[in-house]
Each structure stands twice: as C-alpha cells, then as structure tokens.
Amino acid sequence: MVTHSKFPAAGMSRPLDTSLRLKTFSSKSEYQLVVNAVRKLQESGFYWSAVTGGEANLLLSAEPAGTFLIRDSSDQRHFFTLSVKTQSGTKNLRIQCEGGSFSLQSDPRSTQPVPRFDCVLKLVHHYMPPPGTPSFSLPPTEPSSEVPEQPPAQALPGSTPKRAYYIYSGGEKIPLVLSRPLSSNVATLQHLCRKTVNGHLDSYEKVTQLPGPIREFLDQYDAPL
C-alpha cells in the first residue's frame, strides 16, 4: 500500500506544504508544535500518514485488541487520528491540537479533566497500561459518541488507584487499551536501542550523565514506544 502524507517526510527540513494540509495553524507556536510532532511520529514506526479510516480498519482487522496506529486525520479540523483495535472492532479517536497541546477528543458532557501533552507520542504513552496490568470489560450502556471518557478505576489490593479510560460508541462502553503499535516499517537497531534507553531513564540526572552526542540522539525521540 502506497500512501502520501499531507506532511513532508525528509526530516522536516522544509516548511509544511500548506497546499497539502487542511487544518489552518492558529499560530506560529502551533505550527512548530505540529512540525515536531510529525518529525517524531515519522521516526516512531507506527505513523501511517494518509491511510483512511477504512484502510486503518483493514490494517487492524486481523490484529489483537489493543493494537493501534496513528494516521493523518480525514477531518479538516484535526491533524491526527488514533485508530485502535478494541474488543468491539476498530475505533477512530481524533487527536485535538489546541492551546499548545495535544489531547484525545472527549465527550463534552464529561466533567473529568482531559490529559494534555506537548507531544503525540507522550499522549499515546499515557494511555498505554504498565506491564502486567489486567484487562477488563464493562456491560453495554446507553449510546454515546465515539470519544474517550475517564472515570476512576478500582484499585487492586495493595496497589495505588489507576485511572481507566473508555470509548462510548454504538451503545457500548469500551475500555480504551493501547498495548501494541502496528509498525509501518522495520525499525533500525539504533532506534530500538534508543527506545530501550528511554524506557530506563527515569530521572533527569541520569540523562545529564550521558555523553553529549547520545543525549542529542535521545532528545530527537524521547519516548519508550
């Protein structure tokens, strides 16, 4: 499958081609935010650029629940969409970009604060459960829109409370679980090593102890996924 993104691919060394883009940037800072997001997404290995919702559904159809990908949004009001395989099929969640941050589009009736991040990768990582976290499901509820909601989850004995996230869609309340990205290309050994290192750098002090070239390489992609 050959697709063409509305964003340039060559290291983001040139400005975004506004003729290929639908959503208008609200400011120079938002432009730079999206430029940085695209650069990191292109290195992530699970950015599928211009695939459509139907194509994303086909790509994820044979994958287990929890498999996900990021693609360009087909909605002119948004830049990116998170497509995820759930226990009820593939769901597409728009990623909002406003106020200098990214967030998943949520139910406007929700009173819960929406997590916001300066990077799409950080957003994705936030919704990924820690290793060993059990999965769960809920019975159907009244219909609502296909947007995430985040009521508190029950804590396991001896553990701290964690927040669970759900998608309301087609009369169901579906747990939002991001467990494995769907790779669009083969990652280099350098990138795999970088992700591993990022996952073990839990303090700023550890980063500053690394040689300058390594710190710069890690800064270019500062996520463990």
Swiss-Prot record:
Phosphorylated on tyrosine residues after stimulation by the cytokines, IL-2, EPO or IGF1. Low expression in lung, spleen and thymus. Expressed in Th2 but not TH1 cells. GO terms for biological process: branching involved in labyrinthine layer morphogenesis; cell differentiation; cellular response to interleukin-17; cellular response to leukemia inhibitory factor; intracellular signal transduction; negative regulation of inflammatory response; negative regulation of insulin receptor signaling pathway; negative regulation of receptor signaling pathway via JAK-STAT. Keywords: Growth regulation, Phosphoprotein, SH2 domain, Signal transduction inhibitor, Ubl conjugation pathway. Induction: By a subset of cytokines including EPO, leptin, LIF, IL-2, IL-3, IL-4, IGF1, growth hormone and prolactin. Changing L22A: No effect on LIF-induced signal transduction suppression. Residues 131-160 are annotated as: Disordered. GO terms for molecular function: miRNA binding; phosphotyrosine residue binding; protein tyrosine kinase inhibitor activity. The keyword Phosphoprotein applies. It comes from the Eukaryota. Residues 177-224 form the SOCS box domain. Residues 34-45 are annotated as: Extended SH2 subdomain (ESS). Residues 46-142 form the SH2 domain. Pathway: Protein modification; protein ubiquitination. It holds the Pfam family SH2. GO terms for cellular component: cytoplasmic side of plasma membrane; cytosol. Changing R71K: Little effect on LIF-induced signal transduction suppression. Loss of EPO-induced signal transduction suppression. Abolishes binding to JAK2 and EPOR. Interacts with multiple activated proteins of the tyrosine kinase signaling pathway including IGF1 receptor, insulin receptor and JAK2. Binding to JAK2 is mediated through the KIR and SH2 domains to a phosphorylated tyrosine residue within the JAK2 JH1 domain. Binds specific activated tyrosine residues of the leptin, EPO, IL12, GSCF and gp130 receptors. Interaction with CSNK1E stabilizes SOCS3 protein. Component of the probable ECS(SOCS3) E3 ubiquitin-protein ligase complex which contains CUL5, RNF7/RBX2, elongin BC complex and SOCS3. Interacts with CUL5, RNF7, ELOB and ELOC. The ESS and SH2 domains are required for JAK phosphotyrosine binding. Further interaction with the KIR domain is necessary for signal and kinase inhibition. SOCS family proteins form part of a classical negative feedback system that regulates cytokine signal transduction. SOCS3 is involved in negative regulation of cytokines that signal through the JAK/STAT pathway. Inhibits cytokine signal transduction by binding to tyrosine kinase receptors including IL6ST/gp130, LIF, erythropoietin, insulin, IL12, GCSF and leptin receptors. Binding to JAK2 inhibits its kinase activity and regulates IL6 signaling. Suppresses fetal liver erythropoiesis. Regulates onset and maintenance of allergic responses mediated by T-helper type 2 cells. This is Suppressor of cytokine signaling 3. It comes from Mus musculus (Mouse). The lineage of its organism: Eukaryota, Metazoa, Chordata, Craniata, Vertebrata.
